[in-house]
UniProtKB/Swiss-Prot annotation:
Protein name as annotated: UPF0314 protein R03235
GO cellular component: plasma membrane
Main location: membrane
Assigned protein family: Belongs to the UPF0314 family.
Keyword Transmembrane (UniProt): yes
Transmembrane intervals: 16-36, 152-172
Amino acid sequence: MTIAAGSQDDKQRRAALWLLACLGVLAIQVLVQHLMGRLWICECGYIKLWEGVVKSSGNSQHLSDWYTPSHVIHGFLFYGLGHLLMRGKPWSARLLLATVIESAWEIAENTPMVINRYRAATISLDYFGDSILNSAMDTLAMAVGFLIASRLPVAATVAIAIVLELFTGYMVRDNLTLNVLMLVWPLDAVKAWQAGV
């Protein structure tokens, strides 16, 4: 075996360990949400690939929904953050950072405090938190976004993010930008527009 081959094997082994750590973080997220009393799947008792009705009790309960693009964009943003904070580290180590951030958000988002904030400040009156399945899929959507950003030029990643934001904003009057705005600094005019008033 040559030195180069041994070095490549070491890189692959380290990458596999980082990816296992990512799965470990996801498992901790699932366990914590289970201990918080979150439902595994939709209360309806079945699993849908796509839930297309935002103002429904099925939103944030199934495999994907109109907020899945927001989590893909999280992946874009976290890739950029990892690039800034962890230069020289392998992409798999940066993915671990991204997974920790996303999992922490998914846990926080499903606490009574944040759920009540969503219900008070946004159009999400029917929001009672994510199912564990939906939350795990949100984290996986972030990982997909991270991997896309790791492969595409920055301009293409930014263009995709803008298209996703405009498309979801047009289709359901909500997206990542509006979600953050209304959670942090709610505006009555935006809330009225989102409600279709």
